[in-house]
A protein has these predicted regions:
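Metallo-beta-lactamase
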Residues: 22, 41-76, 83, 88, 92-142, ...
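Active-site loop-helix segments enriched in His/Asp/Glu that coordinate
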Residues: 75, 82-83
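Conserved beta-strand hairpin/beta-sheet module of binuclear metal-dependent hydrolase folds
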Residues: 1-53, 150-167
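Short acidic/His/Gly/Ser-rich catalytic and metal-binding motifs that mark active-site loops
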Residues: 24-29, 98-100, 171-175
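Active-site flanking residues adjacent to catalytic metal/cofactor-binding acidic residues
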Residues: 17, 71, 91-92, 143, ...
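Short glycine/proline- and acidic residue-enriched helix-loop micro-motifs
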Residues: 34-43, 110, 175-178, 182
Length: 186
């Protein structure tokens, strides 16, 4: 499954939805993910595929991102968090509480190496209107993890774009009610 990040440009600032896998996981998977996870998961990205170089292709620096919203705190969605020290991070309170309490949610074991940095985390409860104008909304889609959230962006002309992250991998999965392979509760 590809790991994607989404950049939203708004008049009041930029929001990045998910930061992907840490670049170290590509060159030292055991050191970054541990032997068990490195054996199960193969990182296929190439140098330059990480979120910061991709922003560079758009002429942007990490410091120009005002908000980072993590869909959840698995390594493939928050691995690049540390590269955005000036951003405000928007994470569901239930997600952060579960992540910081090992064993609290059976089967849920995010790595503190990916999310536990001295960053400006703003914990949200439920739906959150990022810019206060209804154009960029975070909303809970619990199931994959205790506090998974998705992103809805008003795209204009009555159309919305939804970034579901690991709540639903494809449109076909949604149409057929196929659940994600990894579930905390469903």
């Amino acid at each position: 499954v590809p790991v994607m990040s989404f950049l939203v440009a708004h008049p009041r600032g930029r929001l990045l939805f998910d930061t992907g896998v840490h670049c170290q996981a590509r060159v030292d998977p055991i050191g970054r993910m541990g032997p068990e996870r490195a054996k199960r998961l193969i990182v296929k990205s190439r140098e330059g595929d990480d979120v910061v170089p991709q922003l560079g292709l758009l002429g942007l620096k990490a410091g120009e991102v005002r908000y980072v919203a993590n869909s959840h705190l698995h390594f493939d969605h928050c691995g690049g968090n540390e590269f955005f020290p000036r951003a405000t991070f928007l994470v569901q309170r239930a997600e952060m509480e579960a992540a910081r309490r090992p064993g609290f949610a059976p089967g849920y074991n995010p790595s503190p190496l990916d999310f536990d940095h001295p960053l400006d985390y703003q914990l949200v409860d439920g739906e959150h209107d990022v810019f206060g104008d209804g154009s960029v909304i975070l909303f809970p889609t619990f199931g994959h993890t205790p506090g998974h959230q998705s992103l809805r962006v008003r795209a204009g002309k009555g159309a919305d774009l939804v970034c579901a992250a690991d709540a639903c991998y494809t449109r076909e999965n949604m149409d057929r009610d196929v659940l994600p392979r990894i579930l905390w509760d469903a």
